[in-house]
Amino acid sequence: MLILLGLLCLYTGLYVARTYWRLRHFPGPLVARFTDLGRLWWVKTSRSHHHHMGLHSRYGQYVRLGPNMISISDPDAIPLVYPIRPGVPKSDFYRSMMPYTRKGRSLPLVFNTRDEDLHKRLKTPIAHLYSLSNILTFEAFVDQVLEILFRQFEERFVPDQAPFNLGNWLQYFAFDVMGTMSFSRRYGFLEKGRDDTGLLSAIWAFMKAAAPVTQMPWVDLVWNKNPFIALFRATPAQPILNVVLSRINDRRNELYSTTSTPEKVNERDFLSRFMHIQSNSDTIPPWAVTAWSFSNVIAGSDTTAVAMKTLWYNLLLHPATMHRLRKELVQAQQQSKLSHPFPAWNEISGLPYLNACVNEALRIHPPFCLPFERIVPAEGMTIGDHFFPGGTVIGMNPWVINRHRPTFGEDADAWRPERWLEDPARTRQMENTLLSFGAGRRVCLGKNIALLELKKLTSALVLHYELEIVNPEKFQSQNFFFFKQEGLYAAVKRRSAGSPELYPDDAVPH
């Protein structure tokens, strides 16, 4: 036993000495030279994005966050760290983000699988489903959920104009849209005004368990993905998997009880298309439908909700922004360029100030805020004036990159949508630097869904309602890779001019 302990200590000592020596020229806090405990703790505090920003302000564009981890804030490095072609693989960070089942198995997703061949087998068959042209076939689903949201506003909040938790309702909207797109079934959050499925709390519990150990992946194996421990407690991802598996089983039962083919049963939603794709391929893993659906539930909904809350918090906090946005939308409406009651994507996607507000929301508060980690290939690589030995973990934090002052301006910490309209060349540079949805070959598949929801919801709300923020100082965020934003309260009333009433007083639909 003593011999084993001695060998372990020797191995640990040699590892620390080796990593310390080969990366010794990179600046950073003292603790980062010897252990990853510092960066685990920063995530545990739910404020790692502020810690990382402070470290880059102090040490520069290349900061050592751990014995073998360098954080980079130079936008010129984006195409090198996140290339279009394979060669710079994901780190063990992403293994920690894999859902773990009671059967002792991790569920690889398109987002978190490190195996390039498996990634190709998972992504290639479904990538076209997330193209803008295909996402627009779901636009009617967004309109259906918008109608339910506005109906709830009319019944619950417009009559007495009492403050309500706008942030919760934006999140309910995002989840019910994705439920409709994925399964042709809403979760029912909007009708009930709450989540009685436990899904939202389960997602947050999963992120709180997974995010800290992404910084020390061996802890994930010992605690979150330990088969022995799983015998005595539910894994954090299990409640989410239960929702996904329930929807899949319901669809299969529906198929068995009818003469319809998989293509004909709810042929417009994601699940039917997932099942059809899998049934026509011998190379797709048998659990792929579960993995694809899980991604839609957790990433397709929660990250969109973060962008919505950020956008609406800033619209309500900055009246000049709201005035200019409403002026743009009302002008388009008066020129008969917008459908009623809900503007269509092709009518609003080119509106300059709406696009500027959406871009600014995604910039100032990206949905994901830990470095997207990659492993330097064995031969090493040079970035800027620095050589990185093979095996070094490198990454870029969207929160830090999106505040790069030479790119976004000296006021990069401030909300200012106008920055996106001032100079076409600079706008292109900012768009190429924006890291909110990732970059390269592993860019987020759900980007088009998020943009569709953001622009349709925002344009419809601005045209039909006036909202006033209540106690804005209570709005706060916690970061566990995904964000949890709380405290966005507002009062709402119908607009008195500028657009026809959505629902006449005597004709509120039920």
Curated annotation (Swiss-Prot):
Its EC number is 1.-.-.-. Heme binds at residue 444. Transmembrane segments: none annotated. It comes from the Eukaryota. It holds the Pfam family p450. InterPro entries: Cyt_P450, Cyt_P450_CS, Cyt_P450_E_grp-IV, Cyt_P450_sf, Cytochrome_P450_monoxygenase. The keyword Heme applies. One of its GO terms (molecular function) is heme binding. Keywords: Heme, Iron, Metal-binding, Monooxygenase, Oxidoreductase, Signal. Pathway: Secondary metabolite biosynthesis. Residues 1-17 form the signal peptide. Its cofactor is heme. Cytochrome P450 monooxygenase; part of the gene cluster 41 that mediates the biosynthesis of an extracellular and diffusible metabolite that is able to stimulate colony sclerotial production. Belongs to the cytochrome P450 family. This is Cytochrome P450 monooxygenase AFLA_114810. It comes from Aspergillus flavus (strain ATCC 200026 / FGSC A1120 / IAM 13836 / NRRL 3357 / JCM 12722 / SRRC 167). The lineage of its organism: Eukaryota, Fungi, Dikarya, Ascomycota, Pezizomycotina.
